[in-house]
C-alpha cells in the first residue's frame, strides 16, 4: 500500500496545485485498486472485515496525505456494502476512528458530514452524529456539509437539518474555505 500511496500522492498533489481550488475534500472510494461501487471489494469479506479494512486504509491515507481540507463522508463504505444491515458498529473500530480524528485535528483538517445518508439510506449523514459528537469531544472544530447532490434538484438537500444538529453538538459555525484557507 505504501508504494501505491506515494505514487498517487505525488500525482494528486500535482493536480491539486495546478488549479485554484478553494476547498478540497479527501475521500476514500477505492482500496487496492477496487472501487466500492462495483462490489468487488466486498467479495469474500464479512461486513466487519470490510469495515475494518476501510477504516484502517482511511487512517493510512489521512496520515500520508496533506493536500485536502476535510475528510469526506467517513461512512461511505456503507452505501455500497452488500450487507442487509447497512449500519456501521462504530464501537468495533472506535480506536481507529479516534486515531483518524486525532490525526485530522493535529493536521488542522476537518470532517465533512455528507447528507446523502438521509437520501440513500433514510437514516442520517455520513458519518453519523454520534461520530460527529466524538470528533467534537476530541476538540475537532473544522466541519463542513456536503450533499453528493450530482443533480441540481438535490443541491443543499438536508443541509439545514445537519446544521441544526451541529449547533446541538456545540459547533459555532460550519467551515467554509477560500483559496484553501478556512474563512
Regions found by a protein language model. Give the residues of each.
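Extended substrate/RNA-proximal surfaces in nucleic-acid metabolism proteins
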Residues: 1-106
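Charged catalytic cores and adjacent phosphate/nucleic-acid-binding surfaces used
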Residues: 32, 84-183
Amino acid at each position: 500500500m505504501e508504494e501505491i500511496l506515494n505514487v498517487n500522492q505525488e500525482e494528486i498533489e500535482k493536480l491539486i496545485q495546478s488549479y485554484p481550488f478553494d476547498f478540497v475534500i479527501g475521500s476514500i472510494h477505492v482500496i487496492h485498486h477496487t472501487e466500492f461501487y462495483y462490489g468487488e471489494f466486498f467479495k469474500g469479506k464479512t461486513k466487519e472485515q470490510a469495515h475494518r479494512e476501510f477504516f484502517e486504509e482511511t487512517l493510512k491515507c489521512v496520515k500520508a496525505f496533506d493536500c485536502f481540507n476535510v475528510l469526506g463522508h467517513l461512512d461511505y463504505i456503507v452505501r455500497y456494502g452488500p450487507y442487509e444491515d447497512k449500519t456501521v458498529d462504530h464501537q468495533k473500530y472506535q480506536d481507529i476512528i479516534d486515531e483518524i480524528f486525532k490525526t485530522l485535528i493535529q493536521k488542522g483538517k476537518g470532517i465533512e458530514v455528507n447528507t446523502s445518508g438521509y437520501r440513500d439510506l433514510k437514516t442520517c449523514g455520513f458519518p453519523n452524529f454520534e461520530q460527529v459528537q466524538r470528533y467534537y469531544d476530541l476538540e475537532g472544530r473544522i466541519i463542513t456539509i456536503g450533499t453528493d447532490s450530482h443533480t441540481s434538484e438535490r443541491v443543499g438537500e438536508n443541509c439545514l437539518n445537519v446544521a441544526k444538529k451541529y449547533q446541538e453538538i456545540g459547533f459555532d459555525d460550519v467551515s467554509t474555505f477560500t483559496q484553501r484557507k478556512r474563512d
